[in-house]
Amino acid sequence: FFDRSEKKNQLRLLQGDARQIIPALQESWDLVFIDADKISYIDYYNMLVPRMAAGSFLLADNVLFHGEVLQDELKGKNAKAIAAFNAHVQADDRTQNVLLTVRDGLMLIRKK
């Protein structure tokens, strides 16, 4: 699909462990979309937010994790990780957020 895009010169596909790739990048971003291993969401967030300009956005997918994060007792490592991520973002004074309850949950996070 990159080859079909009129922006193909601006696109670059990076594959591998994002916890190793992100620190090696020199760019800053206006929009970031996270849909990756749930256990590492907090790591990604902590690496990305400092490199984002004020007013930029981070979108985190699957933040309801099949509704499991709404249960009284969290089961499974992914549900626990997403619940921890949601609490982590909510407590971060650097950002504002809203959780959209579409499909499996999408959190829209804006850096102040």
Language model regions located:
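S-adenosylmethionine/decaboxylated-SAM
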Residues: 1-112
